[in-house]
Amino acid sequence: MKIALVHDWTIHMRGGEKVLDALAELFPGATLYTLFSDRKKLSPNLRRLRIKNSFLQYLPGIRHFYRWLLPLMPFAVRSLQIEDADLVISSSHCVAKGIRKPAGAFHICYCHTPARYLWGFEETYFSRFIVPVRRLIAFFLDRLRRHDLESNAGVDLFIANSECVRERILKFYKRDAIVIHPPVDI
């Protein structure tokens, strides 16, 4: 069975990347698709994978300003072409679940959370900006929400990392999920 792993970005080893590391240990022959990465910051399991990055990888200094590129991320993840896979496993808190799966492939999304800055925590993320900037952000957030909802169509099975996330998936995506707690200390 050919397996593709997908993660939003891999530039450090935080909670989501530790889950991805556990998946890489289970599927050492998988290819990893990600928006951008920094191999030097990754675990040995992740460094051993074949890594395919989006065009965002080639922007100088991407690690320092990637949050400002959020409006481009849905396009970037859709630009990644999974060459051949029977199973796609996305580890997603942003746009990874929006990857195009090959015909006949099954897509499991291990959802760390529906994107907080889109669903319920906008004030936490954007209240510090002046009003004209917040209006511009609201314009993009509306489009990003639509993309986020549309990208759910390609997911065959949602796995939530907690009961709280399962409830958020049900509330915002109108999809059920099974709960599998992270297999790592986070």
Task: Report each predicted region and the residues it spans.
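Nucleotide-activated donor-dependent transferases that construct or modify glycoconjugates
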Residues: 1-13, 35-36
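Active-site donor-binding segments of glycosyltransferases and PAPS-dependent sulfotransferases
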Residues: 26-97
